[in-house]
Amino acid sequence: MATQAKLYRSERPQLVPPNMWTLLTFEKRIRNDRSMTRDLSLIMPPFDGDFLWSRNLRWAAITLPEGDTRPRQFMSRFIRDPAGVRDDTGAADHPVTPGRSWETTTWQFWGEAGMPVGVEVWHDHHEPWPVEHAQFVGTTWDY
């Protein structure tokens, strides 16, 4: 049987400033085996183990100013220990059109006891832009 923590956001968008990696926060816990979720933004394994980490997110639809043809970049990544010695992994830079596509990424990496993991997002649009929907899941079969 799997041990799983799952965080979810869909009711209130999270506004993300441009050119700054921002830790996603979530609105609720869907599943919280072994009390692994922290502050509605992090999953912290209680024991070492192999984990399957997944994230699913959607940026709000974007409207560009007339004549603005500059390409935009919208990225996401998993981040270990975001408030301490930061270690990012599983970064994704998909050619997405915000609001018209979903980004789903799964990455297998070690879950260390007491080491929190989160999801960060980044964009280079000229103004803050919202993430409308996000899910973050950590799953292990090691305990």
Region locations from a protein language model:
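Extracellular jelly-roll beta-sandwich "head" domains, especially the C-terminal globular C1q domain
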Residues: 1-143
